[in-house]
Amino acid sequence: AMHMLQHKPLQRKRMLLVDESPKIHNDRTWCFWEKEAGLFEPIACKQWDQLLFHSDTLSKALSIAPYRYKMIRGIDFYRYCMDALQKHPGVEFLQGKVEAIHSEKTGVQVDGKQYTATYVFNSIPPPNPVLSQKDVWLLQHFKGWMIETDRDVFNPAEATLMDFRMSQKHGTAFCYVLPISANRALVEYTLFTPTLLQPEEYDRELATYVRQHLNLTDYRIAESEFGIIPMTTYRFSKGENNVINIGTAGGQTKGSSGYTFYFIQQHSQKIVAQLLSGKHPRVANAPARFHFYDSVLLEVLRQNSLPGHEVFTTLFRKNKPQPVLAFLNNASSLPTEARIISTLPTLPFLRAALHQVF
């Protein structure tokens, strides 16, 4: 909706936005990198062009210009969008539960009431996708603390992208640290595994990391967040007839990283371009080779033939950050991709590729 309303021909359209949640809490944080200022530049609460990477065998400062790593708080996003959308009389909001989506007579059922439309843009993923034998389905799950200290302890000019200096017993696990100021930072514990942990395990690992690697024992937890994102080779449907799937439901979560926000913006821009030209708004996803790259890495992680921390350590040890970030944004060229792939251990990736192909 926000992308549509940037264009006068689409501002005349009537839109109904349906969500079960009132969106009044700071329940999540989005991070991404891009070169240019995007639509949500005004609400990026912090940006960095200096990142840090840590593992047991590598500590490296990453200067990522012309990229900037950006952070958006959920509550800022909700307020910004609500304020902008409420200025348009054709936009209506409805808080309720979507009980059914109809692709024949295009519309939705919300709390027992039917609504019809020219198009339905659906962001609700299927509850029980049917996986093939080759499909990999891992979970990226994370718990984050916004911590505050009385003294200045953080360098707000640099963020930690990945820090693998922690137990890998459950699978690929790392923390990232996003300092908003010298005494306030988001510390997030992230795992790529088939199953979730017990709630207290996330807190225990976060407390250990903060104590051992941030050297902090005196701090306050101002906010906390928890989330789960699928990391999968499963091909989500683009939709049916005039129902267009968007977000994770439309395959906009990158399988190998879990990053979603940036890809949603790219997808939304393509949808708007189709609408402006009078065409059907179902658009192609990224080139198929990127899905293949994701599937190979996920297969490596599933087989545990090469631990995730070794994969990412090798990527950042042997490559400059800019091509790696372009690669992870599905924005790299074939020669760049070939160079990056050549730096990774051949055998585990070859086996995984063969398993995915055959």
Feature map (PLM): residue ranges:
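Flavin-binding catalytic cores
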Residues: 195-225, 241-244, 265-289
